[in-house]
């Protein structure tokens, strides 16, 4: 296997990727899947073996917590490093990573025997990785670089610091959490117990990503109660719940969809629609960077439901609308130095920081609103949440480089 400047990094990542930890948005437990619990226990044993202190799984939020003690004789702000262990809502059984060494930057990459390929035409980002080692899927599952790349990078950092005591640093807190992909992982994060002054999630994408702004996010769950009667006698009697759902969807702006928007444009995303004539259920994601536009989107959906119920003559449509997280940038006001530290670390290493409003969210969004400023750093993954996911080993190495540089800068007088 490819030699790495950080021994064990690639091996760790592949080992972690093979463990199924898909979170379950229908579960009411924490973590949502027992497989996450098993993996967290596996990682706890690894951190204990590396000599980290106070290794434990938090009894309420199931975060795996650990401390790298300071080796410097003066006060230094405590840095936190966070990642999540669950993977997204895509097949994660029997993940079989493929290692492509010295990729030429121009060829298509077959994904095992699945018949799928990573093609230059469809994924031009591949051109950036000429001469690098890529880890891909075999075409049947996702890879899980989101966020097991981040997990591997943090644990590799811990191992490297153990082997290099000459690197002076303050106390570092590590937190590896569940259920980020279903939006609940950080809901019960205990900032006081974690004990950091500032933190970073290592959960971003390609080299240089530094995210200090996210969407505001809400979810809308809509249930429609129809009335099913024989089609031969349906006139003025039948209420087709499926058709009501279609009518509702058609009242939303056609261009306010993920596939029609970019940059700071918000959207409504209908990502589940199940139904019969008798009952239908629609689930929407509502997203916008601008708080006022976010609130307006929610009110527009409420108004559509009210109008449809009025037209039906009775309340056949119920709406459960709730916020999921808020724009990270608002919570980071007054803590710009946390972003600047990461930016300077990248610049000192010759990496161009790529700072832009991310079209998504991170656990750092929630954690920042709980009082711990937590921007997001790149972990390396491309095409996440899909069979076309891949990651560059060299980008993962540079993620560790950046963490080491940040630690050094934080320890400077």
Curated annotation (Swiss-Prot):
Q: What is its EC number?
A: 3.4.11.4
Ligand binding (Zn(2+) 1): 84, 146, 203
Task: Say where the protein is mainly found.
Answer: cytoplasm
* Catalytic residues (positions): 86, 180
Task: Name one matching Pfam family.
Answer: Peptidase_M20
* Reactions catalysed: Release of the N-terminal residue from a tripeptide
Q: Which InterPro entries match?
A: ArgE/DapE_CS, Bact_exopeptidase_dim_dom, Peptidase_M20, Peptidase_M20_dimer, Peptidase_M20B
Tell me the compartments it is located in.
Cytoplasm
Database matches in NCBIfam families: peptidase-T (TIGR01882), PRK05469.1 (NF003976), PRK13381.1 (NF009920)
Q: What biological function has been recorded for the protein in this entry?
A: Cleaves the N-terminal amino acid of tripeptides.
What this protein is called in its record is Peptidase T
Give the species this sequence originates from. Answer: Limosilactobacillus fermentum (strain NBRC 3956 / LMG 18251) (Lactobacillus fermentum)
Give the gene symbol. Answer: pepT
């Amino acid at each position: 296997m490819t030699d790495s400047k950080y021994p064990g990094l690639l091996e760790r990542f592949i080992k972690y990727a093979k463990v199924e930890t898909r979170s379950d948005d229908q579960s009411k437990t924490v973590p949502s899947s027992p497989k996450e619990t098993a993996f967290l226990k596996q990682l706890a044993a690894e951190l204990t073996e590396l000599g980290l202190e106070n290794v434990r799984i938090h009894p309420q939020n199931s975060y795996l917590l650990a401390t790298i003690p300071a080796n410097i004789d003066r006060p230094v702000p405590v840095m936190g490093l966070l990642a999540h262990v669950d993977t997204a809502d895509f097949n994660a059984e029997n993940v079989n990573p493929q290692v492509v060494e010295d990729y030429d930057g121009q060829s298509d990459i077959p994904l095992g025997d699945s018949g799928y390929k990573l093609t230059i035409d469809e994924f031009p980002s591949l051109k950036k990785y000429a001469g690098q080692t890529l880890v891909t899927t075999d075409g049947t599952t996702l890879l899980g670089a989101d966020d097991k790349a981040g997990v591997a990078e943090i644990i590799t950092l811990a191992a490297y610091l153990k082997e290099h005591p000459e690197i002076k640093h303050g106390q570092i807190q590590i937190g590896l959490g569940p259920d980020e992909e279903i939006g609940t992982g950080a809901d019960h994060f205990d900032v006081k117990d974690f004990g950091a002054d500032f933190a970073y999630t290592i959960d971003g994408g390609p080299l240089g990503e530094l995210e200090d702004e996210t969407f505001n996010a809400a979810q809308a769950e809509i249930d429609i109660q129809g009335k099913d009667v024989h089609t031969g006698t349906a006139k003025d009697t039948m209420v087709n719940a499926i058709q009501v759902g279609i009518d509702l969807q058609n009242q939303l702006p056609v261009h306010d969809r993920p596939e029609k928007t970019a940059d700071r444009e918000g959207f409504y995303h209908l990502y589940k629609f199940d139904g019969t004539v008798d009952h239908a259920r629609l689930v929407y994601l509502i997203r916008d960077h601008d708080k006022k536009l976010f609130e307006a989107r929610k009110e527009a959906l409420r108004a559509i439901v009210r109008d449809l119920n009025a037209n039906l003559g009775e309340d056949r449509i119920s709406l459960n609308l709730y916020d999921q997280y808020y724009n990270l940038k608002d919570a980071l006001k007054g803590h710009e130095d946390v972003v600047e530290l990461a930016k300077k670390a990248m610049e000192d290493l010759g990496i161009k920081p790529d700072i832009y409003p991310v079209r998504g969210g991170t656990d750092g969004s929630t954690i920042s609103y709980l009082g711990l400023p937590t921007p997001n750093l790149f972990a390396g993954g491309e095409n996440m949440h899909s069979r076309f996911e891949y990651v560059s080993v060299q980008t993962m190495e540079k993620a560790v480089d950046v963490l080491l540089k940040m630690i050094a800068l934080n320890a400077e007088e």
